[in-house]
Amino acid sequence: MIRRLAAFSALSGLATAWLPEVNKKITSTNGTNLFTSSNGKIRGVNLGSQFVFEPWIAEKAWSDMGCGGQKSEFDCVSRLGQANANSAFASHWGSWITQDDIAEMVSYGLNTIRVPVGYWMREDLVYSDSEHFPQGGLQYLENLCEWASDAGLYIIIDLHGAPGAQTPQNPFTGQYAPIAGFYQDYQFERALKFLEWMTTNIHQNDKFRNVGMLEVVNEPVQDAGKVGSMRSSYYPNAFKRIRAAEQSLNIDRNNYLHIQMMDRLWGSGDPNESLTDTYYAAYDDHRYLKWASVAVSKDSYISTSCSDQLNSNTPTIVGEWSLSVPDNVQWNSDWSPDSNKDFYKKWFAAQVTAYERQQGWIFWTWKAQLGDYRWSYQGGLLLTRPGIGDQQVLTL
């Protein structure tokens, strides 16, 4: 079981780095340490649409739930009614990511999962007269984390959907909100209560034993001037409340959770700006060249990824990335996933190499219904060479 990430240099060749198992090893129930082959680097996948459904990822599953045509979980629950929605989402939670998926991840050398969740998993935080979210998700999160812990995977739980929505018009917040309503004291307080509750669950429930990191909000607005209160109030209070919850349980400092924030490169300002204590702080960066200011050519993408340094707050995990390219070219002959597999393999290797200059990477996402491996690790291309960290894959 791991809670601690610490300084390390010998294996990586970097001046400083950190390894999940320096102080506490993660092992599966049969004693396997998945981090040995990766020299301690995080190599993982996101479990997109498991607990925060993004309809674009899996339109068929969304439609089968009775949610077709709805933009978000909030909208679907409003349409179906609470009881019918609870039944539909329970069926989804029990089938989208299974124990077989966890075993498949391990078989291909992955060692980490990032689990997006919404604040509504703590059901007493939901305003019953105005908010509509599925109920009953916690037991499915417990089961998932138990499977992953038994398999030896490291687990990051990510507050993907914040109260009021941290960004507008995006289903990854759980609601298709017209404005970003998160950046207010009363919404911060709801998120802080979620973090306290989640922290307590993690430390008291053995099923969560491999959860070592809690991300306090995913992808806030990329405008530092608009989210100053997040840096001055929410981030420092998140540290205080999480640590207070741990202290109330008499958790040893070595067993504290890492507290993760988006890094400075994300564009929401320096997360450390108002922090007085960064003990066990960690950082997240998301790197999608699809939307970056990069020339749209294969040479440019390879060159950019090979030279990516992503030097910002440390330690940083590249917590989301993909192989997708701009919408206007993604299906033409020069970029088609079927006829350009050699390029995508090289680009995958270039990105992996760059992100392992930091602490590692988590691909978005494990599973999709797009018929496009550029968004789905399980989709096939990325699994053609078991042991993703071997030299054949990482050498261009």
UniProtKB/Swiss-Prot annotation:
InterPro entries: Glyco_hydro_5 (IPR001547), Glycoside_hydrolase_SF (IPR017853), Glycosyl_hydrolase_5 (IPR050386). Its main location: secreted. It is found in: Secreted. Glycans are attached at residues 30, 272. GO terms for biological process: cell wall organization; glucan catabolic process. The active site is at residues 219, 320. Residues 1-17 form the signal peptide. Beta-glucanases participate in the metabolism of beta-glucan, the main structural component of the cell wall. Acts on lutean, pustulan and 1,6-oligo-beta-D-glucosides. This is Probable glucan endo-1,6-beta-glucosidase B.
